């Protein structure tokens, strides 16, 4: 049976691995599963707004309402507000506690249900909450040491996620700005008309039709599309006589165009 040191090493080793795809609906599912396995419990990670980032159900709780939280990926406001007022780990909360993960209607079925809440901090900010629970067995002192370490590790990963998201947004904004600055007045006019033709972020268009409607040459539209594609703003594919298929992959172009209108 792994001892405390071995379990601690397993948790800290999580920092050496990346989270699931940041585009995934639950980017921290794998991490939650690893922590649940190490601490021997059910676990979930929510951000400051109560959005579910990842969870692992090692043991069946038979609570439909809790499982609904996981399906909608959003915890109720009253619970999020209560959890946000927890500044230090609250351990071994009974089913009668307001912070218990076990709904009131199932108290009789899980009279020995235990919940532990740990705040997640990173860079001096509250980033979320780490929630673990068991159907009966209390969390020992060793378990709680692991919880403290786990919440710190999750905090570091959440901070990394925020940094990566910020860097990605800056990269996209920079790409849009540089692309816009290379466009002539006519090309800017063409881009606005092209994006207005799309059904959301993608669609089919005919360059000659757009050119005739806004009073520019087809070559202007072709040049504008080429510049946007080389900047990673759009993807395009010729459909032959049917026109061109277009997909926007950097949505920042829409906001940038509004600034020029």
Swiss-Prot record:
Q: Where does it localize?
A: Cytoplasm
Q: Name one GO molecular function term.
A: DNA-binding transcription factor activity
Looking up HAMAP family in the UniProt record yields:
HTH_type_CodY (MF_00621)
Organism of provenance: Streptococcus agalactiae serotype Ia (strain ATCC 27591 / A909 / CDC SS700)
Region (GAF domain) residue ranges read 1-159
Q: What is its main location?
A: cytoplasm
Q: Its function? A: DNA-binding global transcriptional regulator which is involved in the adaptive response to starvation and acts by directly or indirectly controlling the expression of numerous genes in response to nutrient availability. During rapid exponential growth, CodY is highly active and represses genes whose products allow adaptation to nutrient depletion.
Which Gene Ontology cellular component terms are annotated? cytoplasm
Q: Name the Gene Ontology biological process terms.
A: negative regulation of DNA-templated transcription
Q: Which NCBIfam families match?
A: codY_Gpos, PRK04158.1
* Protein name according to UniProt: Global transcriptional regulator CodY
